[in-house]
């Protein structure tokens, strides 16, 4: 009898690089991968199906705006941009829970290169706060563990009067 795999979801999945690392271990079962860009989602579906042998890859990849968390959880129908999906609640219920959340929000607002290129140093960039959607996923699904990755520039990014890393750390601490 085989070992039970660790059930994971990947947020801000991009083309699936982080997910691939977890899948390569052989210990993880990717329940869902959330990404809002069309081309990376097609790549994710292909990787899950062809490389990792998930026959239901299209259902596991949720192409949606993670900031619309209520719909992301409950599902959506006939959205002009994103079509229809059952949402994370149903996928996670079908998997009988979730063990790990992996992912990291887009790095442009945190990276030193991104801040140098922007005349306001990315202080007004909404991506500074996409971690809040990650927190909502943690609060609702209560995984045993999470992996939140990003660029080294996150340690010095300061969109307001406080370093963003302090705000993120406090949010994680409050979540438990």
Predicted regions and their residues:
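Conserved active-site and SAM-binding loop architecture
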Residues: 1-176
């Amino acid at each position: 009898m085989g070992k039970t795999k660790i059930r994971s979801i990947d947020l801000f999945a991009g083309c699936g690089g982080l997910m691939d690392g977890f899948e390569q271990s052989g210990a993880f079962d990717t329940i869902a991968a959330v990404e809002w860009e069309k081309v990376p989602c097609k790549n994710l579906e292909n990787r899950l199906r062809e490389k990792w042998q998930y026959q239901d890859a299209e259902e596991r990849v949720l192409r949606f705006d993670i900031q619309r968390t209520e719909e992301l959880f409950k599902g959506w129908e006939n959205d002009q941009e994103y079509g229809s999906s059952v949402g994370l609640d149903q996928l996670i219920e079908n998997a009988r829970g979730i063990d790990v959340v992996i992912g990291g929000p887009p790095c442009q607002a945190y990276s030193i290169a991104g801040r140098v290129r922007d005349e306001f140093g990315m202080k007004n960039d909404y991506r500074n706060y996409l971690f809040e959607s990650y927190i909502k996923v943690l609060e609702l699904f209560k995984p045993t563990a999470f992996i939140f990755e990003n660029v080294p520039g996150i340690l010095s990014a300061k969109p307001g009067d406080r370093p963003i890393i302090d705000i993120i750390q406090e949010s994680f601490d409050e979540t438990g």
